[in-house]
Each structure stands twice: as C-alpha cells, then as structure tokens.
Amino acid sequence: LQPGLEYQYRYSARV
C-alpha cells in the first residue's frame, strides 16, 4: 500500500 493509504488505513483500523 502507498504511504498515504497505509497511514489512513492504520488510523481507521485503530478505532
């Protein structure tokens, strides 16, 4: 995954 996508993906998955 891309750097931007990975960041958003992990951030959303944290919830």
Swiss-Prot record:
<comment type="function">
    <text>Forms stable clots in the presence of calcium.</text>
</comment>
<keyword id="KW-0353">Hemolymph clotting</keyword>
<keyword id="KW-0964">Secreted</keyword>
<comment type="subunit">
    <text>Homodimer; disulfide-linked. Also exists as oligomers.</text>
</comment>
<dbReference type="GO" id="GO:0042381">
    <property type="term" value="P:hemolymph coagulation"/>
</dbReference>
<keyword id="KW-1015">Disulfide bond</keyword>
<dbReference type="GO" id="GO:0005615">
    <property type="term" value="C:extracellular space"/>
</dbReference>
<protein>
    <recommendedName>
        <fullName>Hemolymph clottable protein</fullName>
    </recommendedName>
</protein>
<keyword id="KW-0325">Glycoprotein</keyword>
